[in-house]
UniProtKB/Swiss-Prot annotation:
Subcellular location: Cell membrane
GO BP, sorted A to Z: phosphatidylethanolamine biosynthetic process
HAMAP family: PS_decarb_PSD_B_type1
Cofactor list: pyruvate
Site, as annotated: Cleavage (non-hydrolytic): 251-252
Name of this protein: Phosphatidylserine decarboxylase proenzyme
Family the entry assigns: Belongs to the phosphatidylserine decarboxylase family. PSD-B subfamily. Prokaryotic type I sub-subfamily.
GO terms, molecular function: phosphatidylserine decarboxylase activity
Keywords: Cell membrane, Decarboxylase, Lipid biosynthesis, Lipid metabolism, Lyase, Membrane, Phospholipid biosynthesis, Phospholipid metabolism, Pyruvate, Zymogen
Subunit-structure text: Heterodimer of a large membrane-associated beta subunit and a small pyruvoyl-containing alpha subunit.
Modified-residue entries (Pyruvic acid (Ser)), positions: 252
């Protein structure tokens, strides 16, 4: 059965399906939208008591519901100054060292940091022998992405690619999954060196957005695009620890990269399959 599921992943028109779902998710369809939201809440056991707007009727589109805000204070940002924090609600897929430019995906599968970053050798070099963490966001999760540490945006890269589903089955069977799927790479300058936040798309991910550029995907293309940003002066964009930096509309996975010697160790509860909550301690900063 698993082989059939993987074969279907290769065969189905993933981009077409994703864009059609995206159009439906953005449409205002009144009672149809409300019914879809109610079904989704029941199907995935979503705790709407955490949402700033708890009523399904409060959302005019499915996208509005999916990117719903939380009540103020529901995800407090850890005040431990020697720790970075979880950027999202989700589950840890993998975390650990970047060895010889390779990132661990699943048993028997690795991919290169160079490929993940859109074959930008100068960017990949900054993360040689550093650390990575991959966090998967399930449909039930809060889908806004926040800063693990205060940082100033220096670069954003859009990398075209596939739109395979992201789950344990595909991670174990699709080589280089996160370096094959469409993604947006944001690089920040922080007190512990460069940090990459890679927002990875997947099947039926309607769009990837950042707070500075709005919707980055779609539209899509076959070219890698890079935008450079000033890190000093009035035009520089600096985001505080815990500040929102982006969001997924029906979305997927965040891969974080850190430079060599930036992190001392991951928090004790940060292990594969561990549930994450945005704002909680994630990794200790190297002294």
């Amino acid at each position: 059965m698993d082989k059939i599921k993987i074969a279907l992943q290769y065969m189905m028109p993933k981009h077409l399906i994703s864009r059609l779902v995206g159009k439906l998710a953005a449409a205002e369809m009144g009672s149809v939208t409300t019914a879809a939201i109610k079904w989704f809440i029941k199907q995935y056991k979503i705790d709407m008591s955490e949402a700033a707007q708890s009523s399904p009727e409060a959302y005019s589109t499915f996208n509005d519901f999916f990117t719903r805000a939380l009540k103020p204070g529901i995800r407090p940002i850890s005040d431990k100054k020697d720790y970075i924090v979880h950027p999202v609600d989700g589950a840890v897929s993998q975390c650990g060292p970047i060895k010889h430019g390779q990132i661990f995906q699943a048993k028997g599968h690795e991919y290169s940091s160079l490929a993940l970053l859109g074959d930008r050798a100068d960017d990949a070099k900054r993360f040689e022998d550093g650390d990575f963490a991959t966090i998967y966001l399930a449909p039930k999760d809060y889908h806004r992405i926040h800063m693990p540490i205060k940082g100033t945006l220096s670069k954003m890269t859009y990398v075209p690619g596939e739109l395979f589903s992201v789950n344990p089955l595909t991670a174990e069977n699709v080589p280089g999954l996160f370096a094959r799927n469409e993604r947006v790479v944001a690089i920040f300058e922080t007190e512990i060196g460069p940090m990459a936040m890679v927002l990875v798309g997947a099947t039926i991910v309607a769009s990837i957005e950042t707070i500075w550029a709005g919707t980055v995907t779609p539209p899509t293309g076959k070219k890698v695009f890079t935008w450079d940003y000033p890190t000093e002066g009035p035009a520089a964009l600096t985001l505080d620890k815990g500040a929102e930096m982006g969001r997924f509309k029906l979305g997927s996975t965040v891969v974080m990269l850190f430079a060599k010697d930036a992190l001392d160790d991951f928090a004790d509860d940060v292990t594969p399959k561990a549930v994450t909550r945005m704002g909680q301690p994630f990794a200790k900063i190297e002294d």
